[in-house]
């Protein structure tokens, strides 16, 4: 085996003959001389480095002390920046009679899919894994002690370790590692691989362990040890934060083998291979701990015992990486978010004044995350209640959301996690949605083939439209009108094998086919809060290009307002404070807020977060901001659509809508197939909100909605008249049922000047990504924007609004933390 010093000796010999040139250079003397100079410089530098390492090894003690140890590492092998071994120990470790068998067994486990290995590096990996001592940190005095053992240590053992504090003296090398933030930048040692790591069981089935920085030979003792007083429970059904190869990308995941762009920006020294493995090892450990127990705050003290590796590497991880990486992931809202107690410390002693306009979920999310990060904020809410569009009604005996109540995809969804943290009940929805026409006929059960054919055709056409715009960026945008749907079918018939040819369209588009197609278009209008003629064919579903939350949809049966009430605890929320003007152009870099109530004094702040709805911005931005917002921001506000739906719920004396499919799935919602095209946005889907009232009595409630051309129905008719239309529709769908309404409730978001909408949509002619991204941009590090209208990947949802609040809180902290938002 060739040692490093032998390689260096050859470099020294080569450096003594720098003037040699190849025949191809002889014809060009200047070029030849330049090359000679460069070669001389490189050789001299190489010689200098070789001598430095040689001298260093001559002075160092061998860390292994095996067999016939030479005591010093002269002519030996460097294992890390501060650890080396002599040639004798290095050879004994894998060739000696006492260790050869162990090496063979270790090698079989360690190959881990490898067919070829670099022998010296592979042996270094073996030495790192089995021979280097552990360094345990005393939980009382924080001094490090060397522990020599052939057995691997567990997180519990490292957590419990206590030294004889008075007599323990750390070696100079330990001090050196403590002080050297670039200790890992060493080209000779093998990167340490984590043992008994908590992320192992999450990654082993999908990745080669060494590429994620784990030791495949030593993972039997991985375990969480600190539950923070809350019982451990399985969260895999709601969380999966590591990307699984060859599967669809979902929201809120990371790739365990690669750093994200913002991670590279924050930790530029670790941005490139192979050094990035050090960052990834700590990051993956932290995320795995959060994934397995997201019910208490992750702290440095909890993470330290989970970083298990032999040698000085463990000191480096603990002293230089855990804290900044945990801080970064916390600020970004990747971990340590939600509804539980945090240990709050002021950020670097700073006390900036932060105002948040609007106390809906995005505003409350911003304020709560800031508070977790050590910064207080004041929320100004125009209404006499907080919560925004998360508002429940209990008048019918069960919780019915006037606004948001549906979790759209429950895997990695922060709303699902909030429910779990708080203890709020939610019910996963099945996908059985029977379609019933106004003659009482259930297409899903009686005409299943036609129902499936229409569903396939509808989705194929939309897929063809999406594919066309993806393949041809210059293809002009058009409105996604119902009158164009048949045109789209003809236009894209050749793009999808699932579409019929134009010659078959007349036989395809029967009256029943078109009625079922209208149901799907009506459902699309509900999803966007507007008529399909207003939607961009190019970008109506622009968020589908991002990873969405996976899993089933769910209904928050306890009501979404409980989430808001919990998150708002301890925050400074000032109700009945409508804002009149925000002066952000002052020379002193302060932002001054004026209120509609003339008796309320104006207040100055360092930073202001605007979380009002898009509808409010559309109506007021021209007079609300002084000076006016940048033209690009104004255009984005004008370009994005403010969708609107209104909800109606009615209580009945019995559950008359029981329907089951062939698999016995009970109906949780059902669709109405209208005879008239214009009625498809009138009570398109009915949701079952039945449950127990506070007295434990069965309560039967259906909820539906109006949108598009029918959305103003709740304002032009009385609530009783709207409820009568609701029941009249149900009587047509269930002609033999006895339908006795006992009460009703409905929303009036469109008439609320402090809300004015439900959720956003991308109108014809707008660019979805550009518009959402412009809306989220901060201005001059003084004005910040949050809300579902500012998040391109998850608009229209509680989760999107909540995440936008975490995002802006993180942006504020990053701007305050230091001029350069790096964590090294």
From Swiss-Prot:
Tissue spec: In hermaphrodites, expressed in gut cells, embryonic cells and sheath cells. Not expressed in sperm or pharyngeal neurons.
Recorded family membership: Belongs to the flavin monoamine oxidase family.
InterPro entries assigned: Amino_oxidase (IPR002937), FAD/NAD-bd_sf (IPR036188), Flavin_monoamine_oxidase (IPR050281), Homeodomain-like_sf (IPR009057), SWIRM (IPR007526), WH-like_DNA-bd_sf (IPR036388)
Record function comment: Histone demethylase that demethylates di-methylated 'Lys-4' of histone H3, a specific tag for epigenetic transcriptional activation, thereby acting as a corepressor. Acts by oxidizing the substrate by FAD to generate the corresponding imine that is subsequently hydrolyzed. Plays a role in the mitotic development of the germline. May be involved in H3 demethylation in mitotic cells including gut and embryonic cells. Plays a role in sensitivity upon interstrand cross-link DNA damage, probably by positively regulating the expression of mlh-1.
EC number(s) recorded for this UniProt protein: 1.14.99.66
Cofactor: FAD
Species of origin: Caenorhabditis elegans
Intracellular or extracellular location(s): Nucleus
The keyword Cell wall biogenesis/degradation belongs to this UniProt entry's keyword annotation: no
Residue numbers spanned by region Disordered: 1-31
Residues engaged in binding FAD: 352-407, 579, 788, 796-798
Database matches in SUPFAM superfamilies: FAD-linked reductases, C-terminal domain, FAD/NAD(P)-binding domain, Homeodomain-like
Name of encoding gene: amx-1
Consequences of knocking out this gene: Embryonic lethality in 2.7% of embryos and 17% reduction in brood size compared to wild type. No larval arrest or high incidence of male phenotypes. Disrupted mitotic progression characterized by a reduction in the length of the premeiotic tip which is where mitotically dividing nuclei are located in the germline, and furthermore the nuclei in this region are disorganized. Increases methylation of 'Lys-4' of histone H3 in embryos, in premeiotic tip nuclei and pachytene nuclei. Increases the expression of spr-5 in mitotic cells. Reduces expression of mlh-1.
Entry annotated with the keyword Calcium: no
Keywords, sorted A to Z: DNA damage, FAD, Flavoprotein, Nucleus, Oxidoreductase, Transcription, Transcription regulation
Pfam family, one: Amino_oxidase
Enzyme class: oxidoreductase
GO biological process: DNA damage response
PROSITE patterns cross-referenced by the UniProt entry: SWIRM
Cellular-component GO terms for this entry: nucleus
Catalytic reaction equation(s): N(6),N(6)-dimethyl-L-lysyl(4)-[histone H3] + 2 A + 2 H2O = L-lysyl(4)-[histone H3] + 2 formaldehyde + 2 AH2
Protein's recorded name: Lysine-specific histone demethylase 1B homolog
UniProt GO MF annotations: FAD-dependent H3K4me/H3K4me3 demethylase activity; oxidoreductase activity
Residues covered by the SWIRM domain: 245-346
């Amino acid at each position: 085996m060739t040692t490093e010093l032998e390689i260096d000796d050859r470099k020294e010999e080569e450096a003594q003959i720098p003037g040699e040139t190849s025949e191809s250079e002889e014809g060009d003397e200047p070029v030849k001389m330049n090359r000679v100079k460069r070669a001389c410089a490189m050789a001299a530098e190489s010689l200098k480095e070789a001598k430095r390492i040689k001298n260093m090894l001559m002075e160092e003690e061998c860390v292994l002390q095996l067999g016939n140890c030479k005591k010093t590492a002269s002519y030996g092998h460097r294992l890390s920046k501060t650890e080396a071994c002599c040639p004798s120990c290095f050879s004994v470790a894998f060739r000696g009679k006492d260790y050869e068998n162990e090496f063979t067994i270790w090698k079989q486990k360690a190959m881990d899919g490898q067919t070829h290995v670099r022998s010296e590096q592979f042996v270094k990996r073996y030495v790192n894994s089995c021979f280097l001592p552990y360094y345990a940190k005393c939980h009382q005095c924080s001094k490090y002690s060397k522990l020599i053992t052939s057995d691997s240590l567990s997180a519990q053992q490292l957590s419990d370790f206590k030294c004889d504090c008075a007599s323990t003296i750390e070696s100079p090398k330990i001090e050196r590692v403590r002080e050297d933030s670039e200790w890992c930048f060493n080209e000779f040692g093998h990167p340490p691989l984590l043992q008994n790591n908590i992320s192992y069981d999450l990654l082993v089935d999908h990745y080669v362990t060494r590429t994620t920085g784990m030791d495949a030979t030593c993972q039997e003792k991985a375990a969480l040890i600190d539950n923070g007083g809350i019982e451990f429970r399985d969260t895999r059904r709601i969380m999966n934060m590591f990307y699984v190869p060859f599967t669809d990308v979902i929201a809120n995941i990371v790739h365990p083998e690669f750093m994200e762009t913002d991670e590279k920006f924050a930790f530029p020294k670790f941005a490139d291979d192979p050094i990035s493995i050090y960052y990834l090892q700590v990051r993956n450990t932290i995320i795995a701990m959060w994934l397995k127990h997201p019910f208490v705050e992750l702290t440095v003290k909890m993470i330290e015992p989970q970083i298990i590796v032999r040698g000085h590497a463990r000191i480096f991880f603990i002293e230089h990486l855990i804290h900044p990486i945990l801080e970064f992931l916390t600020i970004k809202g990747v971990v340590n978010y939600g509804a539980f107690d945090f240990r709050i410390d002021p950020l670097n002693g700073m006390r900036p004044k932060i105002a948040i306009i609007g106390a809906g979920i995005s505003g409350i999310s911003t304020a709560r995350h800031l508070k977790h990060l050590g910064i207080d904020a004041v929320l100004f809410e125009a209404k006499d209640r907080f919560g925004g569009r998360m508002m429940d009604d209990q008048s019918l005996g069960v919780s019915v959301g006037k606004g948001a109540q549906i979790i759209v995809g429950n895997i990695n969804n922060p709303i699902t996690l909030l429910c779990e943290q708080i203890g709020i009940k939610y019910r996963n929805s099945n996908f059985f949605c029977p379609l019933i026409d106004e003659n009482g006929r259930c297409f899903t059960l009686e005409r299943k083939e036609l129902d499936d054919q229409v569903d396939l055709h509808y989705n194929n056409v939309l897929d063809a439209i999406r594919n066309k715009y993806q393949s041809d960026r210059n293809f002009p945008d058009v409105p996604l009108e119902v009158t164009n749907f048949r045109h789209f079918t003809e236009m894209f018939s050749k793009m999808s094998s699932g579409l019929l040819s134009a010659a078959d369209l007349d036989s395809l588009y029967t009256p029943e086919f078109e009625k079922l197609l209208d149901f799907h278009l009506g459902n699309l209008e509900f999803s966007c809060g507007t008529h399909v003629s207003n939607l961009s064919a190019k970008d109506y579903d622009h968020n589908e290009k991002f990873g969405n939350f996976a899993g089933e949809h769910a209904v928050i049966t306890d009501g979404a307002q409980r989430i808001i009430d919990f998150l708002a605890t301890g925050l400074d929320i000032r109700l009945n404070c409508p804002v009149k003007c925000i002066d952000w152009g002052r020379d002193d870099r302060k932002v001054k807020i004026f209120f509609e109530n003339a008796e309320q004094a104006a207040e100055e702040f360092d930073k202001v977060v605007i979380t009002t709805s898009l509808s409010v911005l559309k109506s007021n931005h021209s007079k609300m901001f002084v000076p006016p917002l940048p033209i690009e921001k104004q255009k984005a506000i004008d370009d994005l659509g403010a969708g609107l739906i209104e909800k109606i719920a009615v209580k009945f004396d019995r559950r008359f809508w029981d329907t089951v499919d062939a698999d016995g799935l009970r109906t949780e919602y059902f669709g109405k197939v209208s005879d008239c095209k214009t009625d498809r946005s009138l009570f398109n889907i009915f949701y079952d909100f039945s449950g127990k009232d506070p007295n434990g009595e069965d309560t039967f409630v259906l909820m539906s909605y109006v949108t598009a051309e029918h959305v103003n129905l709740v304002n032009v008719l009385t609530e009783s008249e709207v409820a009568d239309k609701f029941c009249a529709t149900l009587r047509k769908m269930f002609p033999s049922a006895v339908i006795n309404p006992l009460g009703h409730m409905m929303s009036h978001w469109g008439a609320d000047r402090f809300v004015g909408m439900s959720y956003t949509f991308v109108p014809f002619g707008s660019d979805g990504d550009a518009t959402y991204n412009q809306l989220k941009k901060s201005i001059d590090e003084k004005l910040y924007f949050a809300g579902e209208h500012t998040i391109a990947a998850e608009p229209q949802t509680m989760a999107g609004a909540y995440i936008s609040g975490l995002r802006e809180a993180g942006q504020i902290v990053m701007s305050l933390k230091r001029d350069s938002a790096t964590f090294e």
